[in-house]
Amino acid sequence: MPSCQFAGGPAPEGTVPAPAETSPALAAALYVVATPIGNLEDISSRAARTLRAAAWIAAEDTRSSRPLLQSLGIGHARCLALHAHNEESQAERVLDRIRGGESVALITDAGTPGISDPGALLVAAAHAAGITVVPVPGASASTTLLSAAGLPGGRYFFEGFLPTRTRLRQERLQALAANGQAFMLFEAPHRIEALAAELLQALEGEREVVVGRELTKRFEQIVRMPLAALPDWLQADANHCRGEFALLVFGPPARPESDETAESAPSALGLKAMQVLSETMPPRQAAKLAARISGDKADRLYQSALKDK
Protein backbone atom coordinates (compact mmCIF):
# COMPACT_ATOMS: atom_id res chain seq x y z
CA MET A 1 0.00 0.00 0.00
CA PRO A 2 1.61 3.32 -1.05
CA SER A 3 1.87 6.16 1.43
CA CYS A 4 -0.66 9.00 1.32
CA GLN A 5 1.23 12.18 0.46
CA PHE A 6 -0.64 15.03 2.16
CA ALA A 7 0.25 18.44 0.82
CA GLY A 8 -1.53 21.75 0.49
CA GLY A 9 -5.05 22.43 1.75
CA PRO A 10 -6.30 25.08 4.17
CA ALA A 11 -4.45 25.67 7.40
CA PRO A 12 -6.40 24.03 10.26
CA GLU A 13 -7.91 26.11 13.04
CA GLY A 14 -6.41 25.89 16.51
CA THR A 15 -3.28 24.25 17.77
CA VAL A 16 -2.59 20.62 18.51
CA PRO A 17 -0.07 18.80 20.70
CA ALA A 18 3.44 19.19 19.29
CA PRO A 19 5.18 16.08 17.99
CA ALA A 20 7.44 14.29 20.42
CA GLU A 21 11.09 13.85 19.55
CA THR A 22 10.44 10.14 19.08
CA SER A 23 7.22 8.15 18.95
CA PRO A 24 7.65 4.70 20.49
CA ALA A 25 6.26 1.86 18.43
CA LEU A 26 2.82 0.61 19.37
CA ALA A 27 2.05 -3.00 20.17
CA ALA A 28 0.22 -4.85 17.41
CA ALA A 29 -3.46 -4.10 18.03
CA LEU A 30 -6.44 -2.17 16.68
CA TYR A 31 -6.52 1.32 18.18
CA VAL A 32 -9.94 3.00 17.95
CA VAL A 33 -9.05 6.68 18.00
CA ALA A 34 -11.57 9.49 18.51
CA THR A 35 -10.77 12.65 16.56
CA PRO A 36 -12.14 16.22 16.86
CA ILE A 37 -15.63 16.90 15.53
CA GLY A 38 -14.72 20.42 14.44
CA ASN A 39 -12.06 22.10 16.54
CA LEU A 40 -8.62 20.56 16.09
CA GLU A 41 -7.61 21.71 19.58
CA ASP A 42 -9.85 18.95 20.94
CA ILE A 43 -7.39 16.22 19.91
CA SER A 44 -5.95 14.56 23.02
CA SER A 45 -2.24 14.09 23.60
CA ARG A 46 -2.81 10.34 23.71
CA ALA A 47 -4.69 10.33 20.40
CA ALA A 48 -1.97 12.42 18.77
CA ARG A 49 0.74 10.10 20.07
CA THR A 50 -1.16 7.03 18.90
CA LEU A 51 -1.67 8.38 15.39
CA ARG A 52 1.98 9.35 15.08
CA ALA A 53 3.18 5.94 16.25
CA ALA A 54 0.72 3.69 14.40
CA ALA A 55 2.12 1.67 11.53
CA TRP A 56 -1.10 2.19 9.58
CA ILE A 57 -4.07 4.56 9.81
CA ALA A 58 -7.41 3.20 8.62
CA ALA A 59 -9.35 6.35 7.72
CA GLU A 60 -12.94 6.80 6.59
CA ASP A 61 -11.80 9.40 4.05
CA THR A 62 -8.11 10.22 3.77
CA ARG A 63 -8.95 13.58 2.19
CA SER A 64 -11.13 14.62 5.12
CA SER A 65 -8.49 13.48 7.61
CA ARG A 66 -5.71 15.37 5.83
CA PRO A 67 -5.88 18.64 7.87
CA LEU A 68 -5.74 16.75 11.17
CA LEU A 69 -2.88 14.49 10.11
CA GLN A 70 -0.95 17.43 8.69
CA SER A 71 -1.37 19.35 11.94
CA LEU A 72 0.12 16.38 13.79
CA GLY A 73 3.12 16.30 11.51
CA ILE A 74 2.00 13.11 9.82
CA GLY A 75 2.88 14.03 6.28
CA HIS A 76 3.69 10.58 4.96
CA ALA A 77 1.18 8.46 6.83
CA ARG A 78 0.52 4.98 5.57
CA CYS A 79 -3.21 5.10 5.05
CA LEU A 80 -5.90 2.53 4.43
CA ALA A 81 -9.34 3.62 3.23
CA LEU A 82 -12.02 2.02 5.38
CA HIS A 83 -15.53 3.37 4.90
CA ALA A 84 -19.14 2.23 4.89
CA HIS A 85 -18.90 0.80 1.37
CA ASN A 86 -15.79 -1.33 1.84
CA GLU A 87 -15.56 -2.02 5.58
CA GLU A 88 -16.68 -5.63 5.31
CA SER A 89 -14.23 -6.49 2.52
CA GLN A 90 -11.37 -4.42 3.95
CA ALA A 91 -11.65 -5.71 7.52
CA GLU A 92 -9.73 -8.93 6.91
CA ARG A 93 -6.87 -7.05 5.23
CA VAL A 94 -6.59 -4.75 8.22
CA LEU A 95 -6.61 -7.69 10.63
CA ASP A 96 -3.94 -9.46 8.58
CA ARG A 97 -1.62 -6.50 9.13
CA ILE A 98 -2.20 -6.71 12.88
CA ARG A 99 -1.60 -10.46 12.85
CA GLY A 100 1.66 -9.67 11.09
CA GLY A 101 2.80 -7.59 14.05
CA GLU A 102 1.75 -4.11 12.90
CA SER A 103 -0.44 -1.57 14.71
CA VAL A 104 -3.49 -0.01 13.05
CA ALA A 105 -5.24 3.18 14.21
CA LEU A 106 -8.88 3.47 13.15
CA ILE A 107 -10.31 6.97 12.63
CA THR A 108 -13.38 8.47 11.01
CA ASP A 109 -13.90 11.87 9.43
CA ALA A 110 -14.84 13.29 12.84
CA GLY A 111 -15.69 11.93 16.25
CA THR A 112 -15.58 8.37 17.54
CA PRO A 113 -15.50 5.41 15.14
CA GLY A 114 -18.52 3.13 15.32
CA ILE A 115 -20.90 5.83 16.57
CA SER A 116 -22.98 6.72 13.50
CA ASP A 117 -19.74 6.18 11.57
CA PRO A 118 -17.90 3.16 10.13
CA GLY A 119 -15.83 1.01 12.46
CA ALA A 120 -18.21 -1.34 14.26
CA LEU A 121 -17.77 -4.18 11.75
CA LEU A 122 -13.98 -4.00 11.95
CA VAL A 123 -14.01 -3.89 15.75
CA ALA A 124 -16.39 -6.88 15.90
CA ALA A 125 -14.16 -8.80 13.50
CA ALA A 126 -11.11 -8.00 15.64
CA HIS A 127 -12.81 -9.35 18.75
CA ALA A 128 -13.87 -12.49 16.88
CA ALA A 129 -10.28 -13.01 15.74
CA GLY A 130 -8.89 -12.59 19.25
CA ILE A 131 -7.13 -9.34 18.34
CA THR A 132 -6.69 -6.70 21.03
CA VAL A 133 -8.91 -3.62 20.64
CA VAL A 134 -7.66 -0.46 22.38
CA PRO A 135 -10.05 2.51 22.69
CA VAL A 136 -8.49 5.97 22.64
CA PRO A 137 -11.48 8.07 23.74
CA GLY A 138 -12.23 11.65 22.87
CA ALA A 139 -14.74 13.80 21.04
CA SER A 140 -18.24 12.63 20.18
CA ALA A 141 -21.11 14.81 19.00
CA SER A 142 -23.58 12.95 21.23
CA THR A 143 -21.73 13.52 24.51
CA THR A 144 -20.77 17.05 23.46
CA LEU A 145 -24.41 18.05 23.06
CA LEU A 146 -25.54 16.09 26.11
CA SER A 147 -23.08 17.98 28.31
CA ALA A 148 -24.58 21.31 27.19
CA ALA A 149 -28.25 20.24 27.22
CA GLY A 150 -29.18 20.14 30.89
CA LEU A 151 -31.00 16.80 30.67
CA PRO A 152 -32.06 15.74 34.19
CA GLY A 153 -30.54 12.38 35.04
CA GLY A 154 -28.60 12.30 31.78
CA ARG A 155 -30.53 9.27 30.50
CA TYR A 156 -31.32 9.14 26.81
CA PHE A 157 -31.60 6.79 23.84
CA PHE A 158 -29.05 7.26 21.08
CA GLU A 159 -30.66 6.93 17.64
CA GLY A 160 -28.17 8.79 15.43
CA PHE A 161 -29.25 9.21 11.83
CA LEU A 162 -32.78 8.10 10.96
CA PRO A 163 -33.29 5.99 7.81
CA THR A 164 -33.73 8.04 4.65
CA ARG A 165 -36.72 6.07 3.35
CA THR A 166 -40.02 7.62 4.47
CA ARG A 167 -41.67 4.45 5.76
CA LEU A 168 -38.63 3.40 7.78
CA ARG A 169 -38.24 6.92 9.22
CA GLN A 170 -41.86 6.92 10.35
CA GLU A 171 -41.46 3.51 11.96
CA ARG A 172 -38.39 4.61 13.90
CA LEU A 173 -40.05 7.84 15.03
CA GLN A 174 -43.10 5.90 16.20
CA ALA A 175 -40.84 3.58 18.17
CA LEU A 176 -39.02 6.53 19.74
CA ALA A 177 -42.34 8.14 20.65
CA ALA A 178 -43.57 4.92 22.26
CA ASN A 179 -40.32 4.60 24.21
CA GLY A 180 -41.19 7.75 26.14
CA GLN A 181 -37.66 8.87 26.98
CA ALA A 182 -35.23 11.45 25.66
CA PHE A 183 -33.40 10.55 22.45
CA MET A 184 -30.53 11.85 20.35
CA LEU A 185 -30.67 12.36 16.58
CA PHE A 186 -28.16 13.46 13.98
CA GLU A 187 -29.31 15.17 10.79
CA ALA A 188 -27.91 16.74 7.64
CA PRO A 189 -28.75 20.36 6.74
CA HIS A 190 -30.85 19.51 3.68
CA ARG A 191 -33.22 17.38 5.80
CA ILE A 192 -33.42 19.39 9.01
CA GLU A 193 -36.68 21.23 8.24
CA ALA A 194 -38.39 18.02 7.16
CA LEU A 195 -37.19 16.36 10.38
CA ALA A 196 -38.71 19.14 12.49
CA ALA A 197 -42.10 18.56 10.84
CA GLU A 198 -41.80 14.80 11.30
CA LEU A 199 -40.98 15.15 14.98
CA LEU A 200 -44.02 17.34 15.61
CA GLN A 201 -46.24 14.86 13.81
CA ALA A 202 -44.88 11.81 15.63
CA LEU A 203 -44.52 13.10 19.19
CA GLU A 204 -47.27 14.03 21.59
CA GLY A 205 -46.99 16.27 24.60
CA GLU A 206 -45.04 19.45 25.20
CA ARG A 207 -41.52 18.22 24.66
CA GLU A 208 -38.34 20.26 24.63
CA VAL A 209 -35.45 19.97 22.19
CA VAL A 210 -31.83 21.06 22.33
CA VAL A 211 -30.39 21.81 18.89
CA GLY A 212 -26.64 21.63 18.42
CA ARG A 213 -25.50 23.12 15.11
CA GLU A 214 -21.87 23.03 13.93
CA LEU A 215 -20.70 21.77 17.32
CA THR A 216 -17.22 23.01 18.35
CA LYS A 217 -16.84 24.87 15.04
CA ARG A 218 -16.66 28.60 14.37
CA PHE A 219 -20.42 29.08 13.96
CA GLU A 220 -21.50 26.74 16.74
CA GLN A 221 -25.03 27.21 18.07
CA ILE A 222 -26.68 25.39 20.95
CA VAL A 223 -30.30 26.36 21.53
CA ARG A 224 -32.92 24.87 23.86
CA MET A 225 -36.56 25.46 23.03
CA PRO A 226 -40.01 23.86 22.97
CA LEU A 227 -40.16 21.32 20.15
CA ALA A 228 -43.17 23.17 18.73
CA ALA A 229 -40.96 26.24 18.20
CA LEU A 230 -38.32 24.40 16.15
CA PRO A 231 -39.84 24.95 12.66
CA ASP A 232 -40.17 28.71 13.24
CA TRP A 233 -36.62 28.91 14.59
CA LEU A 234 -35.25 27.17 11.51
CA GLN A 235 -37.15 29.52 9.20
CA ALA A 236 -36.22 32.69 11.12
CA ASP A 237 -32.67 32.77 9.72
CA ALA A 238 -31.22 30.98 6.70
CA ASN A 239 -28.08 30.28 8.73
CA HIS A 240 -30.12 28.18 11.16
CA CYS A 241 -30.43 25.46 8.51
CA ARG A 242 -26.74 25.30 7.70
CA GLY A 243 -24.16 22.87 9.04
CA GLU A 244 -24.38 19.48 10.70
CA PHE A 245 -27.01 18.95 13.40
CA ALA A 246 -27.33 16.99 16.61
CA LEU A 247 -30.69 17.13 18.39
CA LEU A 248 -31.58 15.96 21.87
CA VAL A 249 -35.35 15.57 22.16
CA PHE A 250 -36.52 15.42 25.76
CA GLY A 251 -39.11 12.93 26.94
CA PRO A 252 -42.68 14.07 27.63
CA PRO A 253 -43.16 16.01 30.88
CA ALA A 254 -43.95 13.85 33.89
CA ARG A 255 -47.61 13.72 34.80
CA PRO A 256 -48.61 14.43 38.41
CA GLU A 257 -49.08 11.16 40.25
CA SER A 258 -52.72 10.61 41.18
CA ASP A 259 -53.79 9.05 44.46
CA GLU A 260 -54.79 5.93 42.53
CA THR A 261 -51.38 5.69 40.89
CA ALA A 262 -49.63 6.33 44.19
CA GLU A 263 -51.32 3.25 45.65
CA SER A 264 -50.80 1.06 42.58
CA ALA A 265 -49.54 -2.47 43.02
CA PRO A 266 -45.85 -3.30 42.57
CA SER A 267 -44.65 -4.32 39.13
CA ALA A 268 -44.49 -7.93 37.98
CA LEU A 269 -40.70 -7.72 38.08
CA GLY A 270 -40.76 -6.48 41.66
CA LEU A 271 -43.15 -9.22 42.79
CA LYS A 272 -41.09 -11.93 41.11
CA ALA A 273 -37.87 -10.60 42.62
CA MET A 274 -39.54 -10.46 46.02
CA GLN A 275 -40.74 -14.05 45.68
CA VAL A 276 -37.28 -15.37 44.79
CA LEU A 277 -35.35 -13.32 47.34
CA SER A 278 -37.73 -14.14 50.20
CA GLU A 279 -36.64 -17.76 49.95
CA THR A 280 -33.13 -16.90 51.13
CA MET A 281 -33.46 -13.79 53.33
CA PRO A 282 -35.83 -12.01 55.72
CA PRO A 283 -38.82 -10.23 54.07
CA ARG A 284 -37.69 -6.68 54.82
CA GLN A 285 -34.21 -7.31 53.46
CA ALA A 286 -35.72 -9.00 50.42
CA ALA A 287 -38.04 -6.03 49.87
CA LYS A 288 -35.15 -3.55 49.90
CA LEU A 289 -33.17 -5.57 47.37
CA ALA A 290 -36.22 -6.22 45.16
CA ALA A 291 -36.96 -2.48 45.19
CA ARG A 292 -33.46 -1.76 43.91
CA ILE A 293 -33.94 -4.28 41.12
CA SER A 294 -37.41 -3.19 40.01
CA GLY A 295 -37.72 0.46 41.00
CA ASP A 296 -40.79 -0.28 43.15
CA LYS A 297 -41.10 1.03 46.68
CA ALA A 298 -39.79 -1.38 49.31
CA ASP A 299 -42.80 -0.82 51.59
CA ARG A 300 -45.25 -1.85 48.86
CA LEU A 301 -43.26 -4.99 48.10
CA TYR A 302 -43.09 -5.85 51.79
CA GLN A 303 -46.84 -5.32 52.28
CA SER A 304 -47.57 -7.37 49.19
CA ALA A 305 -45.49 -10.24 50.57
CA LEU A 306 -47.39 -10.11 53.87
CA LYS A 307 -50.74 -10.32 52.03
CA ASP A 308 -49.60 -13.42 50.17
CA LYS A 309 -48.82 -15.31 53.38
Language model: regions and residue ranges:
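Glycine-rich, flexible N-terminal cofactor/catalytic loop recognition
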Residues: 2-84
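Glycine/small-residue-rich loop that forms an oxyanion/phosphate-binding "nest" at active or ligand-binding sites
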Residues: 91-144
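Conserved helicase motor
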Residues: 80-88, 162-165
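Class I SAM-dependent methyltransferase SAM-binding "motif I" and its flanking Rossmann-like core
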Residues: 121-179
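A contiguous loop/helix-start segment that scaffolds small-molecule binding in enzyme catalytic cores
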Residues: 2-9, 16-19, 27, 182, ...
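General beta-strand structural signal in soluble alpha/beta enzymes
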Residues: 59, 133-138, 185, 211
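Loop/turn-to-beta-strand initiation segments
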Residues: 28-30, 100-105, 181-182
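Short active-site oxyanion
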Residues: 51-57, 130-134, 182-183
